[in-house]
């Protein structure tokens, strides 16, 4: 069951283009930091990192573009995949009562776990950044251990 669309979308030429696109988007995401000067050394995490208090508007944009939009896209894609997994058996045998196969459920569960891990790993840092951007004085009241833990 190998789709012709897959061969067309993921040809060697297109795959190289996708890799170049990912790197170009990465550079595009980093460049604004140079102009806003938002990369600074933070002694709490012993690293040069994104300073959330430099520009509230910029921090909000970073959280939206780098966290909220990807979460929305991934949620939409996973829902579409799951709906397709549920609908395919009904299309093949419309009069029968299809059951979800164990491997289909396992695949969905794996995708869901990956999504949850992405959200769990990135949410604390992004929500702290969003809170600091909306209420800059809140930055001093965030416990150091919470801020440090959000990086790991």
Curated annotation (Swiss-Prot):
Descriptive protein name: Melatonin receptor type 1A-like
Compartments, as annotated in UniProt: Cell membrane
KW Secreted (keyword) present: no
Gene: mtnr1al
Extracellular compartment spans: 35-58, 133-144
Stretches of the chain found on the membrane's Cytoplasmic side: 1-13, 80-111
Signal peptide: none
Pfam family, one: 7tm_1
Membrane-spanning intervals of the chain: 14-34, 59-79, 112-132, 145-152
